Amino acid sequence: MKLLFRLLKYAKPYTILFIIAIAIVLSLTFVTLLPPQIVRTAINQYITNENLPLNERFNGIFKMAIYFLLSTSAIFVLEYFSIFLTTYIGGKIVYDIRNDLFKHVLRLPMSFFDKHPSGQITTRIANDTQNVMEFFTSVITSIINDVFLLAGVIFMMLKVSTSLFVNISFVFPILIAAILIFRYFDLKAYRAVRTNISRVNAYLAEHIAGMPIVKLFNAEDFERKGFDKVNKNLYKSRIQQMYVFAIFRPTVSTLYRLAIAAIVWMGAKYIASKSLNFGDLYAFVAYLDLFMRPLEDLSEKYDIIQNTTASAEKIFTLMDESEEHYGDEKGETEIKEGVVEFKNVWFRYTEDRWILKDINVKFQPGELVAIVGETGAGKTSIMNLINGMYRPQKGGILIDNLELEKYNIHELRKQISAVPQDVVLFSGTLLDNVRLFHDEINEEEVKKALEKVYVWDMIERLPEKLYTKIIERGKGISAGERQLIALARSVLFDAKIFILDEATSNIDVQTEERIQNAVRELSRDKTVIMIAHRLATVVNADRIVVVHNGEIVEEGTHKELMQKKGVYYKLYEIQFAK
């Protein structure tokens, strides 16, 4: 219940609209009770009353028909406004929740994303919030409507004939029990279907994304069997759900018809004894139909409340994740020179293994420094620490002799440009992807940045040039072209510190040489750190830092390190061995 109350806090800005919606629902409840009463009056006073002249009977029936038409029209209008208003309120609340949730996700540390798959986070923001919407659109006002309608129906039944109500009251527990049993098994089957749908979706998402590997290794038959397995489980759960529906729905309907038969049989006895009129019997049967609706509705709403509670738990679990609190919001906002220094830095992603051990290194402006080492040595982790994506467990990182914690981390990142190994492009235009949706940057500035990394000639040949559409993560654009666009981003934002993580690994030799020249130009007044696996790209670096098993084991120029014949020498020999 705490979760539901927490959800209701989001309804507070819409309190007046909720009050109006509840007033409409209560009016709807009252008007819904009128049609059986109108027909009852028509039957008792005009249709079966032979004491009235024929023209008076016709006039009375016509008058009742007008009342019936007005009441059904009122029901239509009230239902329209009720549905419209609750859907509007629910949509606004879910809009607010989604916005809050996504804003919170943007402020989460990278360590959170290392532990949680992106599909799970997407489900929380997109699907679970949609489940919550149903709570606001159909549960709150519907429960009020159902409770008052049940009370109203029972009151009207007692008003029509207390004796008949008492005599047939045994059918109510039977109907209620049948509906509850049906709902229990239906919910169980429904949840099994939902679970299997999620598994099918997850299988498709993972294996369609990996389709190049599937085709490359001729794994189509294996994939077909794998999908058939999860698809068959979904099919079986669907059949189980249909079986439950096929058994229980007719059972409930049959019990309802038997209840009507019992009312008609007992009502006939009352009519024969002159203690009940035909109109009273009709009204009683009509009110039984109205009695069934809120019963089924309430049991259905219970299912929705359970689903909402489960979704709310997932939403608030994500919302309660600790935000990134690295740095000082009121701290330093400007990198003046760009001197980066690691002092006795120890870092790990998980408790069981240190990635970096006692790192001591300094990067100066005007100097091109390359970091090399085997795969998994800890090179990329150094970049992540400079960006403030992670916090070291021991030691400190200083920029311009000021600890990273004393900077405003968001302002700091604006002044550090990084080209990662895995370049992400967003849906939109090439222009948007280079300037990263900073509309204040004009096309001419973007063009100059692209020229500096020698990619403008390629873009100029495209039919729509900078307005070429990029689809889903840059599909259709080669890995090399993506890296060039990422380089252009870094050049455009003119940062003090410039980090390239394997940034030329997918580029041809000629373009790579041009990029090296561009990087050399950048290093004249900036701190440039180049993380590289291919040693041919770093031979002209001012200084090379060699990382081995998380430790810095060597430093120097290419020539100096080759003369030492240490780790760097061995790596070089392996790469260039004939």
Residue ranges of each PLM-predicted region?
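Juxtamembrane loop-to-helix connectors within ABC transporter transmembrane domains
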Residues: 2-3, 11, 86-90, 104-151, ...
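ABC-type nucleotide-binding domain
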Residues: 54, 327, 333-578
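Transmembrane helix-loop-helix hairpins at lipid-water interfaces of multipass membrane proteins
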Residues: 18-78, 158-163, 261, 272-278
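An intracellular "coupling" helix at the cytosolic face of ABC transporter transmembrane type-1 domains
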Residues: 110-111, 127-136, 140, 148, ...
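Hydrophobic alpha-helical segments in the permease module
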Residues: 68-75, 79, 172-179, 245-259, ...
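Transmembrane helices of ABC transporter permease
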Residues: 13, 17-30, 71, 141-192, ...
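Cytosolic ends of transmembrane helices, especially the final helix of ABC transmembrane type-1 domains
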Residues: 219, 243, 260, 290-318
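Membrane-integrated ABC transporters
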Residues: 1-32, 47-67, 82-86, 90, ...
